[in-house]
């Protein structure tokens, strides 16, 4: 796959995510070098990588802090050193094979994962009541299990 095709696929994924949540962002989607995004989220909010998986070759990451504030990060295909942040929220909860959080517009992002790492991202739009299957992938893993930290 050439760079133009890879970039167009990434733009399509970001467009789908943004279209699915038309009211969640007050400003633009933030993209920067991976290390800079992770450092900024850690320094500003105490967020660490808690969960991650692969979608069509792109890395999808959820960072979370101990108070449940979270961010959704997407790595553009062919640009492994870049993250984009299209969605943030609070009240990140991890249950058996399900993780979910409330976006800042009151909508809900849910990730359902199978024991073999296959996963599905679902978005419930608070304003429309619409439920969208955003994307699916493989290799989902919990880096930090907050239930074990609290026990």
Give residue spans per PLM region.
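Positively charged n-region of N-terminal signal peptides that target proteins for export
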Residues: 1-6
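Bacterial N-terminal signal peptides
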Residues: 9-19
């Amino acid at each position: 796959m050439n760079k133009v095709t890879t970039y167009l696929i990434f733009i399509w994924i970001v467009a789908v995510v943004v279209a699915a949540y038309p009211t969640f962002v007050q400003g633009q989607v933030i993209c920067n070098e991976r290390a800079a995004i992770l450092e900024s989220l850690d320094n500003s909010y105490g967020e660490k990588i808690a969960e991650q998986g692969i979608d069509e070759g792109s890395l999808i990451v959820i960072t979370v802090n101990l108070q449940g504030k979270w961010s959704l990060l997407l790595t553009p295909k062919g640009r492994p050193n870049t993250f984009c942040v299209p969605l943030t929220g609070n009240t990140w909860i991890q249950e058996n094979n399900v993780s979910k959080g409330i976006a800042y517009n009151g909508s809900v992002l849910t990730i359902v994962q199978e024991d073999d790492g296959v996963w599905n991202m679902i978005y419930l739009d608070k304003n429309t009541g619409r439920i969208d299957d955003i994307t699916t992938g493989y290799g989902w893993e919990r880096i930090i299990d907050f239930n074990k930290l609290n026990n």
